[in-house]
Amino acid sequence: MYSLSSVSKHLILVHILALVATQLLLIRSVSSLNMTNSYLNHKCFVSQGKYKPGSAHEKSLEAIIHSISVGENVNSGYDMMSFGDGPDLVCVVLQCRGDSYGSKCRSCFASAMAGLRRRCPRYKGGIIWFDQCLLEISSIDNVGQLNYGDSFCMSNAKNVGDDPFSFILKWDTLFDNISRIAITEKNKNLKDTNKPALYGAGEKRLGTKKKMYGMVQCTDDLSVKACEECLVANILKFQNCWKSGKRGARVLDRSCNFRYELYPFVNAKTGPNSYFKS
């Protein structure tokens, strides 16, 4: 016979196990998206020189850092500020990934700023890439201009295996569609603009079990035409990096980036526009 006490303890244990199982499922769900914010790369703009401690340039930079940190523009995933003039001009551009805005964007800005200042100490210019944002500091105002000089590619060492030709055809289908979304569909999170989001994401079946996931994005200071030009140029420029059928690759620069993997890495529900599925 079971006592009332033992039954009660058993029910409590079951409840605790259920809570643990729920938490594990939530952790698994988040990790399955691979929503990391890893450091990817950086470049110091050595030619722009360094600033001195306590200089007008440093004060301008500190003022911008504070304004972006406490401002509301990060809620949309993008911010651009400039301060000063001549040799003391400071321009800062922050672009967060389309599904990373608000607190995630603010957190990525803090990580990127700390990382750039550590890797490029007192340089007037530099750029750094994380999974969920890019940050550029410069003494030259190049906002709205295409920049291919800082582009690079990172690819998976492994190939997809059989039939890379079929893989590339499906890659083309996926990226044609998400690029179209990026340059035609407005940002649903912004009510006061009709400008397209310059971000697109989606997935394409590779068979009965596998899927390919892709994402394209341009910085918000670009025009639609410039965004399209940037994506096409980088896809062609780095085709040897991914067109052999790599299991994943990404191309990044100051103006635009794209990525694909065989696992989900963006949040389809928090993107600024529709999510492509095929």
Swiss-Prot record:
Subcellular location, principal: secreted
Annotated protein name in UniProt: Putative cysteine-rich repeat secretory protein 17
Family per similarity comment: Belongs to the cysteine-rich repeat secretory protein family.
Pfam families: Stress-antifung
Secretion signal span: 1-32
Location within or outside the cell: Secreted
One Gene Ontology term, aspect cellular component: extracellular region
UniProt xrefs under PROSITE patterns: GNK2
Keywords per UniProt: Repeat, Secreted, Signal
InterPro entries: CRR_secretory_protein, GNK2, GNK2_sf
Domain Gnk2-homologous: from-to ranges: 39-142, 148-265
